[in-house]
Amino acid sequence: MKIKLEIKRLPHGANLPFPSYASEGAAGMDVVSAEDVILQPMQRYPVKTGFAVAIPNGYEIQVRARSGLALKHGIACPNAPGTIDSDYRGEVKILLINLGSEAFEIKRGDRIAQLILASVTQAVFCEVTDLDDTQRGHNGFGSTGI
């Protein structure tokens, strides 16, 4: 299934590619940086992309790390997956963190993350006095094994 998204190029996004799929079966669109940044070890930074997007109601865009950057350099999205809500109209920024031991240079035009369009189901809470019993019950963190 394909859904059209309206995208607005911002002035500092001139001559940069819009997010795109690297292969026919790719789930995520590669997104590039619109600025030069040097991320020091353990530094977090919201990297500009040079575009804004109108996401249809009932959808979100999830922001995920690129596996190669994570494996080779420790570059990750600290709140992965990040969420861009359908009513947000500002510049898309990619929050990155350098978990590596060396500074990492991002150049304008470098692929920095993946964007995934996903449908959203909103919950409606209904307060009750008791919840149904399950085998797991109140057992939480680590209760089902390592």
From Swiss-Prot:
Catalytic activity: dUTP + H2O = dUMP + diphosphate + H(+)
Pathway participation: Pyrimidine metabolism; dUMP biosynthesis; dUMP from dCTP (dUTP route): step 2/2
Tagged with keyword Ubl conjugation: no
Family per similarity comment: Belongs to the dUTPase family.
InterPro entries: dUTPase, dUTPase-like, dUTPase-like_sf, dUTPase_trimeric
Keywords recorded for this protein, A-Z: Hydrolase, Magnesium, Metal-binding, Nucleotide metabolism
Top-level class of the enzyme under EC nomenclature: hydrolase
Keyword Chloroplast part of the UniProt annotation: no
Record: residues binding substrate: 66-68, 79, 83-85, 93
Functional note: This enzyme is involved in nucleotide metabolism: it produces dUMP, the immediate precursor of thymidine nucleotides and it decreases the intracellular concentration of dUTP so that uracil cannot be incorporated into DNA.
Name listed for the protein in its UniProt record: Deoxyuridine 5'-triphosphate nucleotidohydrolase
Cofactor needs: Mg(2+)
Source organism (scientific name): Zymomonas mobilis subsp. mobilis (strain ATCC 31821 / ZM4 / CP4)
Pfam families in alphabetical order: dUTPase
GO biological process: dUMP biosynthetic process; dUTP catabolic process
Any one GO MF annotation of this record: magnesium ion binding
